[in-house]
């Protein structure tokens, strides 16, 4: 429909009012059911103590949320953090302490030594902020049904309850430049991190990135998982924004390569620099 018809909403009169109401209710239901999380980039220098009232510090808020959720060792969210902080070479374990009810200190264990997270590199600070936020999101998507009942799965009747734990299914995490301050080898691991959260916890992502390494690894995952082989569904969708304010979708082939080409100044920039050096 032409946008001119809806310049002042009078264009709605061309539709059946009952249909408009129905579509609006469907839209409202999906929006109300949608659970959104935001993970921003962590670029500021950190202090050893994180104030519980610091609403401008993304890492401090991530630590505060984790503490408030009362996640204990042995819970899947805690194990998730340990697994990925090792994968990103941050450390082997962590300890969170609250000081006088006013601030937290976050201690990283590396072999037989301990150090404040704030004293580590900015890459470690960035990735721990992301991992903590993801762990909190995973925890918040779960809720407990205290009644008994049943549901059908694979043509089988499954009884549940009481205290049956279920997970919300309409969750989106928005991530801003997750590659900030990370070594290229670690940037590529971000694809595995987000992919695991999607597969294991049914959580979707909307990611803004300039990282070639992250995107390249999604291509490898698509190939290895055969996501472009029917009847599989590819969970990855890449939209490229060109410098000239144009955008287009990047579709994967079965071998993981893209059908479309990126604009100038992205994947070809390294090649252009090498040519100038020759």
Task: Name what the model sees in each region.
Residues 77-83, 87-275:
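Switch/communication elements of ASCE P-loop NTPase nucleotide-binding domains
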Residues 1-88:
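Coupling/switch segment of ABC-type P-loop NTPase heads
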């Amino acid at each position: 429909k032409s946008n001119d018809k809806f310049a002042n909403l009078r264009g709605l009169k061309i539709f059946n009012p009952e249909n408009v109401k129905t579509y609006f209710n469907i839209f409202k239901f999906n929006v109300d059911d949608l659970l959104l999380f935001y993970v921003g980039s962590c670029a500021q220098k950190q202090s050893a103590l994180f104030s519980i009232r610091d609403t401008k510090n993304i890492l401090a808020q991530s630590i505060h949320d984790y503490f408030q959720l009362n996640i204990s060792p042995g819970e899947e969210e805690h194990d998730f953090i340990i697994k990925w902080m090792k994968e990103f070479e941050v450390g082997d374990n962590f300890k969170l302490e609250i000081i006088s009810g006013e601030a937290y200190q976050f201690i990283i264990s590396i072999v037989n030594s301990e150090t404040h997270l704030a004293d580590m590199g900015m890459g470690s600070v960035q990735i721990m902020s992301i991992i903590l936020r993801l762990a909190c999101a995973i925890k918040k998507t779960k809720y407990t049904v205290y009644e008994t009942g049943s549901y059908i799965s694979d043509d089988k009747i499954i009884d549940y309850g009481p205290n049956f734990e279920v997970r919300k299914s309409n969750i989106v995490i928005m991530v801003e430049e997750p590659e900030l301050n990370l070594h290229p080898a670690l940037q590529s691991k971000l694809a595995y991190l987000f992919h695991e959260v999607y597969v294991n916890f049914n959580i979707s992502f909307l990611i803004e990135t300039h990282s070639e390494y992250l995107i390249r690894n999604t291509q490898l995952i698509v190939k290895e998982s055969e996501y472009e082989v029917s009847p599989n569904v590819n969970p990855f969708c890449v939209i490229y924004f060109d410098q000239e304010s144009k955008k287009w979708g990047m579709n994967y082939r079965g071998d993981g390569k893209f059908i479309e080409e990126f604009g100038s100044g992205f994947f070809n920039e390294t090649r252009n620099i090498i040519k100038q050096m020759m």
